[in-house]
């Protein structure tokens, strides 16, 4: 789920809509792993004046799912690029080649964990990639 990019300055609306969207997907697919990713930028932008607050809302959906025992992963978009954020985002908003590569690597880590552990007792619920 990648949801919070263009409509996230209204915190209450984002929290409610993100929660509802997650539950809609989960209801339709109760037995699959879901990867939740927050927006992959950390600086203020035209679309997002407080990205850390939006990430906290997205993370709360994830935490609620973990608490409920659901099969879910979280990718913190604010941590994706590290020191490379200036080259990963071509205009401080949109990922370029390096940004997409780092995003793909984070998702691949989730896929590798799913392939290796499935939803067995070895699954590390709550891990943040």
Question: How does the language model describe each region?
Answer:
Residues 1-129:
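Alpha-helical cap/lid subdomain in secreted, periplasmic
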């Amino acid at each position: 789920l990648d949801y919070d990019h263009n409509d996230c300055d209204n915190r209450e609306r984002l929290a409610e809509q993100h929660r509802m969207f997650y539950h809609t997907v989960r209801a339709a697919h109760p037995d699959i792993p879901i990867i939740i990713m927050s927006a992959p930028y950390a600086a203020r932008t035209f679309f997002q004046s407080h990205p850390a607050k939006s990430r906290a809302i997205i993370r709360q959906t994830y935490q609620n799912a973990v608490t409920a025992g659901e099969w879910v992963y979280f990718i913190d978009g604010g941590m994706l690029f590290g020191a490379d954020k200036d080259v990963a985002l071509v205009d401080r908003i949109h990922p370029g080649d390096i940004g997409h590569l780092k995003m793909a690597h984070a998702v691949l880590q989730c896929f590798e964990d799913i392939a290796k552990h499935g939803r067995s007792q070895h699954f590390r619920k709550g891990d943040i990639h």
